[in-house]
From Swiss-Prot:
HAMAP family: Arg_succ_lyase. Keywords: Amino-acid biosynthesis, Arginine biosynthesis, Cytoplasm, Lyase. It catalyses: 2-(N(omega)-L-arginino)succinate = fumarate + L-arginine. GO terms for biological process: arginine biosynthetic process via ornithine; L-arginine biosynthetic process. Its main location: cytoplasm. It comes from the Bacteria. Belongs to the lyase 1 family. Argininosuccinate lyase subfamily. GO terms for cellular component: cytosol. It is an enzyme of class 4 (lyase). It comes from Kineococcus radiotolerans (strain ATCC BAA-149 / DSM 14245 / SRS30216). InterPro entries: Arg_succ_lyase_C, Argininosuccinate_lyase, Fumarase/histidase_N, Fumarate_lyase_CS, Fumarate_lyase_fam, Fumarate_lyase_N, L-Aspartase-like. This is Argininosuccinate lyase. PROSITE patterns: FUMARATE_LYASES (PS00163).
Length: 481
Protein backbone atom coordinates (compact mmCIF):
# COMPACT_ATOMS: atom_id res chain seq x y z
CA UNK A 1 0.00 0.00 0.00
CA UNK A 2 1.48 3.32 -1.09
CA UNK A 3 1.94 5.88 1.66
CA UNK A 4 2.05 9.65 1.43
CA UNK A 5 5.49 11.24 1.34
CA UNK A 6 4.26 13.95 3.70
CA UNK A 7 3.88 12.59 7.24
CA UNK A 8 1.41 14.88 8.94
CA UNK A 9 3.65 15.31 11.90
CA UNK A 10 6.11 17.27 9.74
CA UNK A 11 3.93 19.56 7.63
CA UNK A 12 0.33 18.95 8.63
CA UNK A 13 -1.75 19.69 11.68
CA UNK A 14 -2.22 16.34 13.38
CA UNK A 15 0.41 13.64 12.76
CA UNK A 16 2.56 13.35 15.90
CA UNK A 17 0.94 10.19 17.30
CA UNK A 18 1.29 8.35 13.97
CA UNK A 19 4.36 6.37 12.95
CA UNK A 20 3.86 7.20 9.27
CA UNK A 21 1.88 9.39 6.95
CA UNK A 22 -1.49 8.39 5.51
CA UNK A 23 -1.81 6.08 2.54
CA UNK A 24 -1.86 7.89 -0.78
CA UNK A 25 -5.48 6.90 -1.40
CA UNK A 26 -6.40 8.04 2.10
CA UNK A 27 -4.75 11.41 1.52
CA UNK A 28 -6.57 11.78 -1.80
CA UNK A 29 -9.91 10.98 -0.16
CA UNK A 30 -9.25 13.40 2.68
CA UNK A 31 -8.05 16.27 0.53
CA UNK A 32 -10.42 19.23 0.18
CA UNK A 33 -8.34 22.17 -1.05
CA UNK A 34 -9.87 21.81 -4.51
CA UNK A 35 -13.14 23.15 -3.14
CA UNK A 36 -12.51 24.73 0.26
CA UNK A 37 -9.66 27.04 -0.72
CA UNK A 38 -12.30 29.57 -1.75
CA UNK A 39 -12.63 30.15 2.00
CA UNK A 40 -9.01 31.30 2.27
CA UNK A 41 -9.70 34.99 2.88
CA UNK A 42 -12.25 34.13 5.56
CA UNK A 43 -9.70 31.82 7.16
CA UNK A 44 -7.13 34.62 7.19
CA UNK A 45 -9.64 37.04 8.72
CA UNK A 46 -10.34 34.50 11.43
CA UNK A 47 -6.63 34.06 12.04
CA UNK A 48 -6.17 37.80 12.53
CA UNK A 49 -8.98 37.91 15.06
CA UNK A 50 -7.63 34.81 16.80
CA UNK A 51 -4.15 36.31 17.04
CA UNK A 52 -5.59 39.37 18.73
CA UNK A 53 -7.47 37.38 21.37
CA UNK A 54 -4.36 35.27 22.02
CA UNK A 55 -2.50 38.54 22.58
CA UNK A 56 -5.26 39.88 24.83
CA UNK A 57 -5.06 36.68 26.88
CA UNK A 58 -1.33 37.18 27.38
CA UNK A 59 -0.36 34.24 25.18
CA UNK A 60 1.38 36.34 22.51
CA UNK A 61 3.72 39.25 23.14
CA UNK A 62 3.54 42.43 21.10
CA UNK A 63 6.35 41.46 18.73
CA UNK A 64 4.84 38.07 17.93
CA UNK A 65 1.41 39.62 17.32
CA UNK A 66 2.93 42.19 14.98
CA UNK A 67 4.85 39.51 13.10
CA UNK A 68 1.78 37.30 12.79
CA UNK A 69 -0.46 40.09 11.51
CA UNK A 70 2.17 41.19 9.00
CA UNK A 71 2.60 37.61 7.84
CA UNK A 72 -1.15 37.12 7.48
CA UNK A 73 -1.48 40.35 5.49
CA UNK A 74 1.34 39.32 3.16
CA UNK A 75 -0.17 35.88 2.73
CA UNK A 76 -3.57 37.34 1.89
CA UNK A 77 -1.98 39.53 -0.78
CA UNK A 78 -0.41 36.41 -2.28
CA UNK A 79 -3.73 34.54 -2.14
CA UNK A 80 -5.55 37.39 -3.87
CA UNK A 81 -2.89 37.77 -6.56
CA UNK A 82 -2.64 34.04 -7.14
CA UNK A 83 1.00 33.93 -6.09
CA UNK A 84 0.07 31.41 -3.41
CA UNK A 85 -1.94 28.29 -4.19
CA UNK A 86 -2.20 25.09 -2.17
CA UNK A 87 0.49 22.47 -2.60
CA UNK A 88 -0.35 18.91 -3.55
CA UNK A 89 0.29 17.70 0.00
CA UNK A 90 -1.94 20.32 1.66
CA UNK A 91 -4.97 18.59 3.15
CA UNK A 92 -7.31 21.55 3.36
CA UNK A 93 -7.48 25.33 3.35
CA UNK A 94 -6.42 25.51 7.00
CA UNK A 95 -3.30 23.39 6.63
CA UNK A 96 -2.34 25.14 3.39
CA UNK A 97 -2.50 28.57 4.97
CA UNK A 98 -0.76 27.54 8.18
CA UNK A 99 2.07 25.99 6.17
CA UNK A 100 2.39 29.17 4.13
CA UNK A 101 2.34 31.35 7.24
CA UNK A 102 5.07 29.28 8.91
CA UNK A 103 7.17 29.56 5.76
CA UNK A 104 6.83 33.34 5.96
CA UNK A 105 7.27 34.04 9.68
CA UNK A 106 8.95 30.90 10.98
CA UNK A 107 7.70 27.97 13.03
CA UNK A 108 8.22 29.64 16.41
CA UNK A 109 5.92 32.53 15.49
CA UNK A 110 3.56 30.84 13.05
CA UNK A 111 3.15 27.76 15.21
CA UNK A 112 1.67 29.79 18.07
CA UNK A 113 -1.49 30.63 16.15
CA UNK A 114 -2.92 27.13 16.49
CA UNK A 115 -3.37 27.47 20.27
CA UNK A 116 -6.99 27.51 21.42
CA UNK A 117 -8.65 26.68 18.14
CA UNK A 118 -9.54 23.64 16.08
CA UNK A 119 -10.35 23.13 12.45
CA UNK A 120 -13.78 22.15 13.76
CA UNK A 121 -14.69 25.60 15.02
CA UNK A 122 -12.73 27.26 12.24
CA UNK A 123 -14.63 25.66 9.38
CA UNK A 124 -18.01 26.11 11.05
CA UNK A 125 -17.25 29.83 11.33
CA UNK A 126 -15.78 30.27 7.86
CA UNK A 127 -18.74 28.60 6.20
CA UNK A 128 -21.12 30.99 7.95
CA UNK A 129 -19.01 33.97 6.90
CA UNK A 130 -18.99 32.82 3.27
CA UNK A 131 -22.72 32.14 3.18
CA UNK A 132 -23.62 35.41 4.90
CA UNK A 133 -21.68 37.37 2.29
CA UNK A 134 -23.19 35.46 -0.60
CA UNK A 135 -26.70 35.60 0.86
CA UNK A 136 -26.65 39.34 0.19
CA UNK A 137 -25.29 38.82 -3.30
CA UNK A 138 -27.98 36.26 -4.08
CA UNK A 139 -30.66 38.48 -2.53
CA UNK A 140 -29.60 41.39 -4.71
CA UNK A 141 -29.80 39.21 -7.81
CA UNK A 142 -33.24 37.92 -6.81
CA UNK A 143 -34.35 41.51 -6.44
CA UNK A 144 -33.14 42.21 -9.98
CA UNK A 145 -35.64 39.60 -11.17
CA UNK A 146 -38.33 41.21 -9.00
CA UNK A 147 -37.51 44.60 -10.47
CA UNK A 148 -37.82 43.20 -13.99
CA UNK A 149 -41.23 41.73 -13.14
CA UNK A 150 -42.46 44.98 -11.58
CA UNK A 151 -41.17 47.05 -14.50
CA UNK A 152 -43.09 44.84 -16.92
CA UNK A 153 -46.19 45.09 -14.73
CA UNK A 154 -45.94 48.88 -14.65
CA UNK A 155 -45.46 49.00 -18.42
CA UNK A 156 -48.74 47.13 -19.05
CA UNK A 157 -51.21 48.64 -16.57
CA UNK A 158 -54.42 47.71 -18.36
CA UNK A 159 -53.40 44.55 -20.19
CA UNK A 160 -55.78 41.64 -19.61
CA UNK A 161 -54.98 37.97 -19.96
CA UNK A 162 -56.59 34.62 -19.19
CA UNK A 163 -56.17 33.57 -15.60
CA UNK A 164 -55.87 29.82 -15.29
CA UNK A 165 -56.41 27.02 -12.82
CA UNK A 166 -55.50 23.46 -13.79
CA UNK A 167 -54.02 25.18 -16.89
CA UNK A 168 -57.60 25.80 -18.08
CA UNK A 169 -59.19 29.21 -18.59
CA UNK A 170 -60.61 30.37 -15.26
CA UNK A 171 -61.15 34.14 -14.97
CA UNK A 172 -59.68 37.22 -16.63
CA UNK A 173 -56.83 38.88 -14.74
CA UNK A 174 -54.49 41.75 -15.42
CA UNK A 175 -51.07 40.87 -16.77
CA UNK A 176 -49.54 43.00 -14.04
CA UNK A 177 -51.45 41.04 -11.41
CA UNK A 178 -50.11 37.79 -12.82
CA UNK A 179 -46.52 39.02 -13.02
CA UNK A 180 -46.63 40.25 -9.45
CA UNK A 181 -47.88 36.83 -8.39
CA UNK A 182 -44.35 35.74 -9.30
CA UNK A 183 -42.72 38.79 -7.68
CA UNK A 184 -44.18 38.25 -4.20
CA UNK A 185 -42.74 34.73 -3.72
CA UNK A 186 -39.32 36.05 -4.73
CA UNK A 187 -39.67 38.88 -2.23
CA UNK A 188 -40.47 36.26 0.40
CA UNK A 189 -37.32 34.39 -0.62
CA UNK A 190 -35.35 37.52 0.18
CA UNK A 191 -37.19 37.78 3.51
CA UNK A 192 -36.10 34.20 4.17
CA UNK A 193 -32.49 35.12 3.47
CA UNK A 194 -32.74 38.04 5.87
CA UNK A 195 -34.32 35.87 8.56
CA UNK A 196 -31.68 33.22 7.94
CA UNK A 197 -28.92 35.79 8.27
CA UNK A 198 -30.07 36.67 11.77
CA UNK A 199 -29.64 33.03 12.78
CA UNK A 200 -26.36 32.67 10.90
CA UNK A 201 -24.88 35.73 12.63
CA UNK A 202 -23.74 33.62 15.58
CA UNK A 203 -20.06 32.70 15.69
CA UNK A 204 -18.86 29.16 16.52
CA UNK A 205 -15.31 30.47 16.95
CA UNK A 206 -13.91 29.54 20.36
CA UNK A 207 -15.75 26.22 20.50
CA UNK A 208 -12.50 24.38 19.84
CA UNK A 209 -12.85 20.75 18.83
CA UNK A 210 -16.08 20.47 20.82
CA UNK A 211 -15.58 21.49 24.48
CA UNK A 212 -14.35 25.07 24.25
CA UNK A 213 -10.98 26.41 25.37
CA UNK A 214 -9.13 26.58 28.68
CA UNK A 215 -6.82 29.40 27.57
CA UNK A 216 -8.96 32.34 28.66
CA UNK A 217 -9.75 33.49 25.13
CA UNK A 218 -12.61 35.85 24.28
CA UNK A 219 -14.92 34.35 21.62
CA UNK A 220 -17.12 37.45 21.69
CA UNK A 221 -14.22 39.63 20.57
CA UNK A 222 -13.59 37.27 17.65
CA UNK A 223 -17.28 37.25 16.80
CA UNK A 224 -17.41 41.02 16.81
CA UNK A 225 -14.35 41.40 14.59
CA UNK A 226 -15.72 38.88 12.07
CA UNK A 227 -19.08 40.62 11.78
CA UNK A 228 -21.16 38.30 13.96
CA UNK A 229 -23.63 39.53 16.55
CA UNK A 230 -22.67 37.05 19.28
CA UNK A 231 -21.06 33.70 20.02
CA UNK A 232 -22.75 30.32 20.21
CA UNK A 233 -24.17 29.29 23.57
CA UNK A 234 -22.99 25.69 23.26
CA UNK A 235 -19.58 24.64 21.94
CA UNK A 236 -20.78 21.19 20.83
CA UNK A 237 -23.63 22.77 18.89
CA UNK A 238 -21.18 25.29 17.47
CA UNK A 239 -18.95 22.66 15.89
CA UNK A 240 -21.46 19.91 15.08
CA UNK A 241 -24.55 21.68 13.73
CA UNK A 242 -25.04 22.50 10.08
CA UNK A 243 -28.66 23.58 10.11
CA UNK A 244 -27.43 27.00 9.00
CA UNK A 245 -26.06 25.43 5.81
CA UNK A 246 -29.17 23.31 5.31
CA UNK A 247 -31.47 26.29 5.75
CA UNK A 248 -29.47 28.27 3.23
CA UNK A 249 -29.70 25.34 0.82
CA UNK A 250 -33.48 25.28 1.32
CA UNK A 251 -33.84 28.96 0.50
CA UNK A 252 -31.63 28.45 -2.56
CA UNK A 253 -33.81 25.54 -3.66
CA UNK A 254 -36.97 27.58 -3.07
CA UNK A 255 -35.57 30.37 -5.22
CA UNK A 256 -34.87 27.77 -7.90
CA UNK A 257 -38.43 26.49 -7.70
CA UNK A 258 -39.86 30.00 -7.96
CA UNK A 259 -37.68 30.75 -10.99
CA UNK A 260 -38.71 27.45 -12.53
CA UNK A 261 -42.40 28.33 -12.26
CA UNK A 262 -41.81 31.63 -14.02
CA UNK A 263 -39.77 29.87 -16.65
CA UNK A 264 -42.37 27.19 -17.29
CA UNK A 265 -44.87 29.89 -18.17
CA UNK A 266 -42.44 31.76 -20.40
CA UNK A 267 -41.74 28.54 -22.28
CA UNK A 268 -45.45 27.99 -22.86
CA UNK A 269 -46.17 31.64 -23.65
CA UNK A 270 -43.47 31.69 -26.33
CA UNK A 271 -45.03 28.81 -28.27
CA UNK A 272 -46.97 29.43 -31.46
CA UNK A 273 -50.11 28.13 -29.79
CA UNK A 274 -49.98 30.73 -27.02
CA UNK A 275 -48.14 33.55 -28.81
CA UNK A 276 -48.22 35.64 -25.64
CA UNK A 277 -44.57 36.70 -25.75
CA UNK A 278 -41.61 37.07 -28.06
CA UNK A 279 -38.22 36.41 -26.53
CA UNK A 280 -35.43 38.89 -27.08
CA UNK A 281 -32.66 37.59 -29.32
CA UNK A 282 -30.05 38.19 -26.61
CA UNK A 283 -31.80 35.74 -24.30
CA UNK A 284 -32.58 32.99 -26.82
CA UNK A 285 -30.68 30.41 -28.83
CA UNK A 286 -31.12 28.73 -32.18
CA UNK A 287 -30.87 25.27 -33.67
CA UNK A 288 -27.93 23.69 -35.44
CA UNK A 289 -30.26 22.19 -38.06
CA UNK A 290 -33.56 24.13 -38.02
CA UNK A 291 -32.96 27.72 -39.15
CA UNK A 292 -36.29 29.04 -37.90
CA UNK A 293 -35.87 28.02 -34.27
CA UNK A 294 -35.75 30.52 -31.41
CA UNK A 295 -35.43 28.53 -28.24
CA UNK A 296 -36.17 29.67 -24.66
CA UNK A 297 -32.93 28.26 -23.29
CA UNK A 298 -32.72 30.61 -20.30
CA UNK A 299 -36.10 29.41 -19.10
CA UNK A 300 -35.29 25.78 -19.81
CA UNK A 301 -31.97 25.99 -17.98
CA UNK A 302 -33.75 27.62 -15.05
CA UNK A 303 -36.12 24.66 -14.90
CA UNK A 304 -33.21 22.26 -15.03
CA UNK A 305 -31.14 24.07 -12.43
CA UNK A 306 -34.07 24.06 -10.03
CA UNK A 307 -33.68 20.30 -9.90
CA UNK A 308 -29.98 20.71 -9.25
CA UNK A 309 -30.65 23.10 -6.36
CA UNK A 310 -33.16 20.68 -4.87
CA UNK A 311 -30.50 17.99 -5.18
CA UNK A 312 -28.01 20.15 -3.28
CA UNK A 313 -30.51 20.44 -0.43
CA UNK A 314 -31.48 16.78 -0.30
CA UNK A 315 -27.87 15.63 -0.52
CA UNK A 316 -26.90 17.84 2.41
CA UNK A 317 -29.85 16.71 4.51
CA UNK A 318 -29.02 13.07 3.79
CA UNK A 319 -25.46 13.69 5.00
CA UNK A 320 -26.65 15.27 8.24
CA UNK A 321 -29.47 12.96 9.20
CA UNK A 322 -27.50 10.23 10.99
CA UNK A 323 -24.63 12.11 12.61
CA UNK A 324 -24.04 11.77 16.36
CA UNK A 325 -22.56 14.66 18.31
CA UNK A 326 -20.11 16.24 17.99
CA UNK A 327 -17.99 16.76 14.87
CA UNK A 328 -17.75 13.94 12.31
CA UNK A 329 -15.72 13.90 9.12
CA UNK A 330 -18.94 13.47 7.15
CA UNK A 331 -19.28 17.22 7.62
CA UNK A 332 -16.58 17.77 5.02
CA UNK A 333 -19.47 17.10 2.62
CA UNK A 334 -21.40 20.15 3.82
CA UNK A 335 -19.59 22.68 1.68
CA UNK A 336 -19.88 21.54 -1.91
CA UNK A 337 -23.71 21.51 -1.92
CA UNK A 338 -23.96 25.10 -0.70
CA UNK A 339 -21.03 26.24 -2.84
CA UNK A 340 -22.83 24.75 -5.83
CA UNK A 341 -26.09 26.42 -4.81
CA UNK A 342 -24.35 29.80 -4.58
CA UNK A 343 -22.55 29.37 -7.90
CA UNK A 344 -25.70 28.17 -9.63
CA UNK A 345 -27.85 31.06 -8.46
CA UNK A 346 -25.22 33.69 -9.13
CA UNK A 347 -25.03 32.66 -12.79
CA UNK A 348 -28.73 31.86 -13.22
CA UNK A 349 -30.40 34.90 -11.67
CA UNK A 350 -28.86 37.55 -13.96
CA UNK A 351 -29.96 35.55 -17.00
CA UNK A 352 -33.53 35.21 -15.74
CA UNK A 353 -33.64 38.92 -14.94
CA UNK A 354 -32.45 39.73 -18.45
CA UNK A 355 -34.97 37.39 -20.03
CA UNK A 356 -37.90 38.82 -18.06
CA UNK A 357 -36.87 42.44 -18.58
CA UNK A 358 -36.79 42.03 -22.37
CA UNK A 359 -39.95 39.99 -22.91
CA UNK A 360 -42.22 41.52 -25.54
CA UNK A 361 -45.83 40.85 -24.57
CA UNK A 362 -48.49 40.51 -27.26
CA UNK A 363 -51.20 42.16 -25.21
CA UNK A 364 -53.82 42.17 -27.98
CA UNK A 365 -53.54 38.40 -28.25
CA UNK A 366 -53.72 38.00 -24.49
CA UNK A 367 -56.71 40.31 -24.18
CA UNK A 368 -58.59 38.50 -26.94
CA UNK A 369 -58.26 35.23 -25.07
CA UNK A 370 -58.96 36.64 -21.60
CA UNK A 371 -62.75 36.05 -21.66
CA UNK A 372 -62.64 32.91 -23.78
CA UNK A 373 -63.38 29.43 -22.47
CA UNK A 374 -66.42 30.67 -20.51
CA UNK A 375 -64.09 32.63 -18.22
CA UNK A 376 -66.96 34.98 -17.29
CA UNK A 377 -69.17 32.24 -15.84
CA UNK A 378 -68.31 33.24 -12.28
CA UNK A 379 -69.37 36.80 -13.09
CA UNK A 380 -72.84 35.49 -13.97
CA UNK A 381 -73.02 33.57 -10.70
CA UNK A 382 -71.95 36.57 -8.65
CA UNK A 383 -74.38 38.85 -10.52
CA UNK A 384 -77.14 36.48 -9.44
CA UNK A 385 -75.89 36.45 -5.84
CA UNK A 386 -75.99 40.24 -5.74
CA UNK A 387 -79.67 39.92 -6.67
CA UNK A 388 -80.45 37.59 -3.81
CA UNK A 389 -80.05 34.20 -5.45
CA UNK A 390 -78.31 31.65 -3.17
CA UNK A 391 -74.86 30.85 -4.51
CA UNK A 392 -75.69 27.15 -4.79
CA UNK A 393 -78.48 28.02 -7.22
CA UNK A 394 -76.41 30.73 -8.92
CA UNK A 395 -73.61 28.24 -9.55
CA UNK A 396 -76.09 25.79 -11.10
CA UNK A 397 -77.65 28.47 -13.32
CA UNK A 398 -74.28 29.72 -14.53
CA UNK A 399 -73.21 26.15 -15.29
CA UNK A 400 -76.38 25.70 -17.32
CA UNK A 401 -75.40 28.76 -19.36
CA UNK A 402 -72.09 27.10 -20.19
CA UNK A 403 -73.87 23.89 -21.17
CA UNK A 404 -76.22 25.85 -23.43
CA UNK A 405 -73.21 27.42 -25.18
CA UNK A 406 -71.73 23.99 -25.80
CA UNK A 407 -75.03 22.67 -27.16
CA UNK A 408 -75.32 25.58 -29.57
CA UNK A 409 -71.69 25.21 -30.61
CA UNK A 410 -72.30 21.60 -31.62
CA UNK A 411 -75.52 22.45 -33.42
CA UNK A 412 -74.11 25.47 -35.23
CA UNK A 413 -70.62 24.16 -35.89
CA UNK A 414 -68.91 27.21 -34.43
CA UNK A 415 -67.66 28.50 -31.12
CA UNK A 416 -70.32 30.00 -28.89
CA UNK A 417 -69.38 32.02 -25.80
CA UNK A 418 -71.49 33.31 -22.94
CA UNK A 419 -72.01 36.71 -24.52
CA UNK A 420 -73.47 34.98 -27.59
CA UNK A 421 -76.46 33.72 -25.60
CA UNK A 422 -79.65 35.45 -26.64
CA UNK A 423 -82.27 36.91 -24.33
CA UNK A 424 -84.38 33.88 -25.20
CA UNK A 425 -81.53 31.50 -24.28
CA UNK A 426 -81.12 33.19 -20.93
CA UNK A 427 -84.83 33.22 -20.13
CA UNK A 428 -85.10 29.53 -20.99
CA UNK A 429 -82.29 28.70 -18.56
CA UNK A 430 -83.69 30.65 -15.58
CA UNK A 431 -86.14 33.45 -14.92
CA UNK A 432 -83.43 35.05 -12.77
CA UNK A 433 -81.36 35.74 -15.89
CA UNK A 434 -82.72 39.14 -16.86
CA UNK A 435 -81.23 40.85 -19.94
CA UNK A 436 -79.15 43.06 -17.61
CA UNK A 437 -76.90 40.09 -16.89
CA UNK A 438 -75.24 40.75 -20.23
CA UNK A 439 -73.75 43.93 -18.73
CA UNK A 440 -71.25 41.85 -16.73
CA UNK A 441 -70.16 39.76 -19.69
CA UNK A 442 -67.08 41.82 -20.53
CA UNK A 443 -63.44 41.55 -19.59
CA UNK A 444 -63.34 45.12 -18.34
CA UNK A 445 -66.38 44.65 -16.14
CA UNK A 446 -65.05 41.41 -14.74
CA UNK A 447 -61.68 42.94 -13.90
CA UNK A 448 -63.12 46.07 -12.31
CA UNK A 449 -65.47 44.06 -10.12
CA UNK A 450 -62.59 42.19 -8.44
CA UNK A 451 -61.82 45.17 -6.23
CA UNK A 452 -61.28 43.50 -2.88
CA UNK A 453 -57.84 43.72 -1.31
CA UNK A 454 -55.49 41.54 -3.33
CA UNK A 455 -57.86 41.41 -6.29
CA UNK A 456 -57.15 41.99 -9.96
CA UNK A 457 -59.12 45.24 -10.33
CA UNK A 458 -56.90 47.93 -11.86
CA UNK A 459 -57.10 50.12 -8.75
CA UNK A 460 -55.98 47.24 -6.55
CA UNK A 461 -53.19 46.21 -8.90
CA UNK A 462 -51.88 49.77 -8.88
CA UNK A 463 -51.84 49.71 -5.07
CA UNK A 464 -50.17 46.32 -5.11
CA UNK A 465 -47.47 47.57 -7.47
CA UNK A 466 -46.68 50.44 -5.13
CA UNK A 467 -46.45 48.05 -2.16
CA UNK A 468 -44.18 45.70 -4.09
CA UNK A 469 -41.92 48.56 -5.12
CA UNK A 470 -41.67 49.66 -1.48
CA UNK A 471 -40.74 46.12 -0.44
CA UNK A 472 -38.17 45.96 -3.22
CA UNK A 473 -36.53 49.18 -2.04
CA UNK A 474 -36.45 48.02 1.58
CA UNK A 475 -34.82 44.72 0.67
CA UNK A 476 -32.30 46.38 -1.63
CA UNK A 477 -31.16 48.55 1.28
CA UNK A 478 -30.18 45.33 3.07
CA UNK A 479 -28.78 43.42 0.10
CA UNK A 480 -26.80 46.30 -1.39
CA UNK A 481 -26.24 48.81 1.42
Amino acid sequence: MTQSTDPQGEKGLWGARFASGPATAMAALSKSTHFDFRLARYDLAGSRAHARVLHAAGLLDDDVLTALLAGLDALEADVVSGAFVPAEEDEDVHSALERALVERVGADVGGRLRAGRSRNDQIATLLRMFLRDHARVVAGLVLDVVEALLTQAAAHPGAAMPGRTHLQHAQPVLLGHHLMAHAWPLLRDVERLRDWDARAAVSPYGSGALAGSSLGLDPVAVARELGFTRSVENSIDGTASRDVAAEFAFVAAMIGVDLSRISEEVIAWATKEFSFVTLDDAWSTGSSIMPQKKNPDVAELARGKAGRLIGDLTGLLATLKGLPLAYNRDLQEDKEPVFDAVDTLEVLLPAVAGMVATLHFHTDRMASLAPQGFALATDIAEWLVRRGVPFRDAHRISGACVRRCEERAIAEGRGVELWDLTVEDLAAISPHLAPAVRDVLSTEGSLSSRDGIGGTAPVRVAEQLEAAQDALAAHLAWARP
